[in-house]
Amino acid sequence: MTELIKKGSAAKEAAQFLAQATTKQKNTALLNLSNDLLAHTSTLLKENEKDILRAQKKGTPETMIDRLRLTEDRMKEISEAVKQVVALKDPIGEVTNMWKNEAELTIGKTRVPLGVIGIIYESRPNVTVDASVLCFKTGNAVILRGGSDAIDSNKALMSVIQDSLEASGFPRSSVQLIEDTSRETARDMMRLNRFLDVLIPRGGARLIQTVLENATVPVIETGTGNCHIYVDKAAEKQMAIDILVNAKCSRPSVCNAAETLLIHRDVAEDYLPAMETALKEYDVELRADERAKEILQEAKAAKESDWEDEFLDFILAVKVVDSAEEAIEHINKYGTKHSEAIISNDYATGQAFHQKVDAAAVYINASTRFTDGFAMGFGAEIGISTQKLHARGPMGLTELTSTKYIIFGDGQIRN
């Protein structure tokens, strides 16, 4: 708890400094950081290798190790991502609305930082940089608590970030890492209302549920991604295959990857064998309901838990449905309100799907893999929010701000 209080207090002070920083000052610091990350790539990769070796000894699945791994190419991507944040418009100070009331007061609504943001996340060291940069750009101080699997990578990255920001004239406490990765410290952080204005968990279902059950700090839930592809009877066969393979296989360990295929009974016998062939190239394990299992050559019988799980692996649950309505009911029952897709050339069915499915992102004839800040065209994101307050969907710079009312008068008093 001592580490949390010390760093929480320092973050509060840093937040006041950051709130006054100009866009030019912040962008200059971020450009310097981008260069410093590249300059320290060799050291960072050596520290990352410690985490990789430890994970391999534990028997961690390769798909999860991939999330942990840093390479020269990934460091270049991380460095470039920092530059892309520099290019984004700074929302701080933006006047979103202005008007006069009956008392002739001029009332303005402007964007301000949230203050101090806490982020608890798992084994993805790139998040250490992404979160630091996004919070910094929006004038927020941030306290990070990464998973134990990535502790050496995170400590090395944090050292580079803090040294770089300090050299640019900013407090080291603008961005801080909790090095104690124990569950007790994580739970203490969830109750750090005295210093944290908001807490954002990024990770699997267990982590997020733990935060929701224990936090007294306001939470923005970045949910798990039990994403579905529904292939309608009016779907184009090759389009359905291409989208399914991309959504499942391009990067199965991320939250916008597809986990369940729902397919209309009228096209199941024709489409499923071709889909199985395409997925076989990636050694995807299929877990099917009774009707789908009769059509597929190699599939395990699906359990109830398979409809609920976020596999984050080359595993796909498959179910044959009688109608689009049944698909929608299934998604709303088992989905995590993240990203859902329908493949159909029937306009009315597509409209019904997007109106009735409860999710942050609903796709018609496109892969769920586009639920991403960069892919959607508004830059880096802190996570994908699956709740409806304070933000929903990919959380970019604007979602890391609050608003303040500025009222100008010339002596008015209220009667």
Curated annotation (Swiss-Prot):
GO terms for cellular component: cytoplasm. Coiled coil: none annotated. Belongs to the gamma-glutamyl phosphate reductase family. Pathway: Amino-acid biosynthesis; L-proline biosynthesis; L-glutamate 5-semialdehyde from L-glutamate: step 2/2. It is found in: Cytoplasm. The gene is proA. Keywords: Amino-acid biosynthesis, Cytoplasm, NADP, Oxidoreductase, Proline biosynthesis. It holds the Pfam family Aldedh. Its EC number is 1.2.1.41. This is Gamma-glutamyl phosphate reductase. Catalyzes the NADPH-dependent reduction of L-glutamate 5-phosphate into L-glutamate 5-semialdehyde and phosphate. The product spontaneously undergoes cyclization to form 1-pyrroline-5-carboxylate. Gene3D superfamilies: Aldehyde Dehydrogenase, Chain A, domain 1, Aldehyde Dehydrogenase, Chain A, domain 2. One of its GO terms (biological process) is L-proline biosynthetic process. GO terms for molecular function: glutamate-5-semialdehyde dehydrogenase activity; NADP binding. It catalyses: L-glutamate 5-semialdehyde + phosphate + NADP(+) = L-glutamyl 5-phosphate + NADPH + H(+). InterPro entries: Ald_DH/histidinol_DH (IPR016161), Ald_DH_C (IPR016163), Ald_DH_N (IPR016162), Aldehyde_DH_dom (IPR015590), G-glutamylP_reductase_CS (IPR020593), Glu-5-SA_DH (IPR012134), GPR_dom (IPR000965). It is an enzyme of class 1 (oxidoreductase).
